[in-house]
């Protein structure tokens, strides 16, 4: 019996020693010095956001100064049964991260506001595994095909083009915002560029995020790349939402210069201020019959006017027998973006000048009569 009491006292002493060691470890972890490196997401103290279920007016910016973070570690000695049950519960309640947007393609007219709305499928902050996430929103412009001449013209107009390249871009790629959520569920974001151009908001309760692009111009034609990352900055899911900037043609005109009788007719159809390039289709009619246009030698049909979109010129050459009246030349223009279609047309009749015909009459070597027809 004495030996049993000794062994019991020894066992208790051992458990007390273990408890003291664990308590000391917990105390030391709770008092980390300021020079200890921690994960970059946890080194900020995000501004709290009220979860009222209403879209926020804005997401607060991250603090300008780095604040120290206190880390507390809970120590427990779980049994095998409790560990298995907790893992099963975590696996059953775990959500696969995803980004679901209301649409993948948004058409916005020039000078209007474009809006994107997405649902963030993430676990609540109580889940330690996914309590931290990062959301990066990057704008990528859509390139358009052009010959070298048009690329240079685009550069002069203020677009981003590479000399010698066959492509031009509205502008370079740009990180719009970087949003973080800390383990407590609070959000913070880096300041958005371009002043009030972009507006980013987060609904903490509904796990939704939105992007607004104000006063859209042709440089905003591209796609937003939304990447959801874990707390180690590893990408979990990526979504592309295209913003199609568009503008219907402002005017359509046909110019048909005068010609001499027997010379070919020439006409040019000018479609001004539309967007994007390639959204306009031109067809010709001669007295109601289809005629084939002639491209310029360098293949270019359009050019940019800074801040006003693109202008297209299509040229056609028609035969002239000199025996018929001048034809009615019509230009039919169809502008299309997505499900939106707009048509217009213009007509011109070229003026024909005839060569003068002169008759002379001679009698006894002298000019008697002359007239011109």
From Swiss-Prot:
Gene3D superfamilies: Immunoglobulins. InterPro entries: Ig-like_dom, Ig-like_dom_sf, Ig-like_fold, Marek_A. The keyword Glycosyltransferase does not apply. Residues 58-93 are annotated as: Disordered. Glycans are attached at residues 91, 111, 203, 345. Residues 69-80 have a biased composition (Low complexity). Belongs to the herpesviridae glycoprotein C family. This is Envelope glycoprotein C homolog. It comes from Meleagrid herpesvirus 1 (strain FC126).
């Amino acid at each position: 019996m004495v030996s049993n009491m000794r062994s019991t006292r020894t066992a208790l002493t051992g458990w007390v020693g273990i408890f003291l060691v664990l308590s000391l470890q917990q105390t030391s972890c709770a008092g980390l010095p300021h020079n200890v490196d921690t994960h970059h997401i946890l080194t900020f103290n995000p501004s709290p956001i009220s979860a009222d279920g209403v879209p926020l007016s804005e997401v607060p910016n991250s603090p300008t100064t780095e604040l120290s973070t206190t880390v507390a570690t809970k120590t427990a000695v779980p049994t095998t049964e409790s560990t298995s049950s907790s893992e099963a519960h975590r696996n059953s309640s775990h959500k696969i991260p995803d980004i679901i947007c209301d649409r993948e393609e948004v058409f916005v007219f020039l000078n209007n506001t474009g809006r994107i709305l997405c649902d963030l499928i993430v676990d609540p902050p109580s889940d330690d595994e996914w309590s931290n996430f990062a959301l990066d929103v990057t704008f990528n412009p859509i390139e358009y095909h052009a010959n070298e001449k048009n690329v240079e013209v685009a550069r002069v107009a203020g677009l981003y083009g590479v000399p010698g390249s066959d492509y031009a871009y509205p502008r370079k790629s740009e990180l719009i915002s970087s949003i973080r959520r800390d383990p407590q569920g609070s959000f913070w974001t880096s300041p958005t560029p371009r002043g009030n151009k972009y507006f980013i908001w987060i609904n903490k309760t509904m796990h939704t995020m939105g992007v607004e692009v104000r006063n859209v111009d042709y440089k905003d034609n591209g796609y937003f790349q939304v990447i959801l990352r874990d707390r180690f900055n590893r990408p979990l899911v990526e979504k592309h939402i295209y913003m199609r900037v568009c503008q219907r043609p402002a005017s359509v005109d046909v110019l048909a210069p005068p010609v001499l009788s027997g010379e070919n007719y020439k006409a040019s159809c000018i479609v001004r201020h539309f967007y994007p390039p390639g959204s306009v289709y031109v067809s010709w009619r001669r007295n109601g019959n289809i005629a084939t246009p002639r491209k310029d030698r360098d293949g270019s049909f359009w050019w940019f006017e800074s801040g006003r979109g693109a202008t297209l010129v299509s040229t056609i050459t028609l035969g002239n027998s000199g025996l018929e009246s001048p034809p009615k030349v019509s230009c039919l223009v169809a502008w299309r973006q997505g499900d939106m279609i707009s048509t217009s047309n213009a007509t011109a009749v070229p003026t024909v000048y005839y060569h003068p015909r002169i008759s002379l009459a001679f009698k006894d070597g002298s000019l008697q009569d002359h007239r011109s027809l």
